[in-house]
From Swiss-Prot:
Reported consequences of knocking out the gene: DNA hypermethylation and transgene silencing phenotype.
Statement: the UniProt record of this protein carries the keyword DNA-binding: yes
Organism the protein comes from: Arabidopsis thaliana (Mouse-ear cress)
Record's protein name: Methyl-CpG-binding domain-containing protein 7
Subunit structure and binding partners: Interacts with PRMT11. Interacts (via C-terminus) with IDM2, but not with IDM1. Interacts with IDM3. Part of a complex made of MBD7, IDM1, IDM2 and IDM3.
Residue span(s) of domain MBD: 21-92, 106-171, 172-242
Residue ranges with Polar residues bias: 1-11
Cellular component terms per the entry's GO annotation: chromocenter; chromosome; nucleus
Mutagenesis or variant effect for R305A: No effect on intranuclear immobility
Matches recorded under PANTHER family: METHYL-CPG BINDING PROTEIN, MBD (PTHR12396), METHYL-CPG-BINDING DOMAIN-CONTAINING PROTEIN 7 (PTHR12396:SF38)
Required for interaction with PRMT11: annotated span: 163-306
InterPro entries: DNA-bd_dom_sf (IPR016177), Methyl_CpG_DNA-bd (IPR001739)
Length: 306
């Protein structure tokens, strides 16, 4: 009794003869030197031949040049990606989403010159029952993982925009210039909070009624409309008038220009709360009225910057 082998020598021979090594020079400029190109007829014997590209050293097979591009673009080891040869001149961008030919019109590409920054790594995870390898781009500092370079680029761009926004907010919150004082005619509206001893101040521009919540906002506004310069800021000094109280409990005070501001004032903080000071100008103590006015100005300055 004879048994028939499931894989006879003649069948193996036919399978080997069907694999044809193609001339790699026909793909010159599209693949790196050393790659092997194999033409493999389909088992249906309908004359269709599939082309496979074999990576030297690893033996990995790729069914398209696009798959090779994605594979090579993701190979980094904590260094910036480098691109060499004419292979990288044209189609070097990596896309995410559907990879079928019908959907290529809707794919999203990373920028042509995009590189992984330092501190990133690439993980390769082979799929089960498949020759396909999934790549994950990992930010080591945070542990965040991304499936494509375009996702990494989008994440970095959004993070950069967020940092720039925070910097703009911090710049807007900066205090006003040290020597800045309200111009003549401006009104300060002080309104005590109901559930707190804190007093909210608003600075009102005469004529327009524009209201600002801080001295820094007033200074930025005056600079933007061209009503103030750095020289005028450094020369402006003001003396506060007594506060006025209306029926609603809102206090108002105006600012006037002191035509002869002192060049130097020697002062020392006093009082239990540290909100009073004694002042000496040209060897003489200032009057109690002036000290009281300056004390209010000093407390207001501290609260504006807090």
């Amino acid at each position: 009794m004879q048994t028939r082998s499931s894989s006879s020598p003649s069948a193996n021979h036919r399978r080997e003869t069907q694999l044809q090594i193609a001339d790699p020079t026909s793909f010159c400029g599209k693949i790196m030197p050393g790659w092997t190109v194999v033409n493999r007829p389909r088992s249906s014997n309908n004359g269709v031949v599939d082309t496979y590209f074999i990576e030297p050293g690893t033996g990995r097979q790729f069914s398209s040049l696009e798959a090779i591009h994605r594979h090579l673009a993701g190979e980094v080891n904590d260094r910036r990606l480098t691109r060499a040869g004419s292979f990288f001149q044209d189609k070097t961008r990596v896309y995410e989403g559907s990879r079928t030919k019908q959907d290529h019109c809707g794919v999203e590409y990373a920028s042509k010159g995009f590189r992984l920054p330092r501190g990133w790594s690439v993980e390769e995870v082979p799929r089960k029952n498949s020759h396909y390898i999934d790549k994950y781009y990992v930010e080591r500092k945070t542990g965040k993982r991304f499936r494509s370079l375009v996702s990494v680029e989008r994440y970095l761009r959004e993070s950069r925009n967020s940092i720039e926004q925070q910097l703009r907010v911090l710049q807007n919150r900066r205090g006003h210039s040290k020597d800045f004082r309200l111009p003549d005619g401006w009104i300060v509206e002080e309104k005590p909070r109901r559930s707190s001893s804190h007093i909210d101040r608003s600075y009102i521009e005469p004529g327009t009624g524009n209201k600002f919540r801080s001295m820094a906002a007033v200074e930025r506004y005056l600079i933007s409309v061209g009503n103030i310069t750095l020289d005028s800021v450094s020369m402006v000094h003001s003396e506060r008038l007594p506060l006025l109280m209306n029926r609603n409990g809102i206090r108002f005070q105006s600012e006037v220009i002191d035509p002869n501001p002192p060049k130097k004032v020697k002062w020392v903080l006093t009082g239990s709360g540290g909100n009073m000071f004694t002042a000496n100008v040209r060897g003489s103590n200032v009057s109690s009225l002036v000290k009281h006015t300056w004390s209010e100005a000093f407390v207001s300055l501290i609260e504006d910057r807090s």
